[in-house]
A protein has these predicted regions:
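Asp-based, Mg2+/Mn2+-dependent phosphohydrolase catalytic module
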Residues: 3, 7, 23-125
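Short, acidic loop-to-helix structural element flanking the phosphoryl-transfer center
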Residues: 1-18
């Protein structure tokens, strides 16, 4: 699942930012013991607009000092996918086409996410 992906991305020095609208995000990361994998965690309370506005993804890219057009956003909600698209990042959905749309790369769950998968999505973009 997600832990394997985080480890793989870290091993390749790929920047990771969390752009969750959940105010419990940092607490959940601590409970899952994965906070250390993230280079930045965006506080949704610091933003003018929530998803589907792109603000949180733009802030995440800025926090890790990358151009948003060089970013992939992974999302499990339609509003989040819309926000990723609006930001200029490349969306990857976790869920179904009925939930998230058929015009993006989709995986049924996080166990299907890997660096090689994300690279193939990026190259196909």
């Amino acid at each position: 699942g997600i832990l394997e992906l985080l480890k793989e991305l870290k091993a390749h020095d790929i920047k990771i930012a969390l752009a969750s609208a959940s105010k419990n995000g940092p607490l959940l990361l601590d409970k899952m013991e994965i906070t250390s994998y993230f280079d930045a965690i965006v506080d949704p309370a610091s933003l003018a607009a929530g998803k589907p506005a792109p603000d949180i993804f733009l802030a995440a890219a800025k926090a890790v000092n990358i151009d948003i057009k060089e970013a992939i956003g992974i999302e499990d909600a339609a509003a989040g996918v819309a926000a990723i698209k609006a930001s200029g990042a490349l969306p990857v959905g976790v869920g179904t086409a009925e939930e998230l749309g058929s015009d993006i790369a989709l995986v049924p769950d996080t166990s299907h996410l890997s660096l090689s998968y994300l690279e193939s999505v990026w190259k196909g973009n």
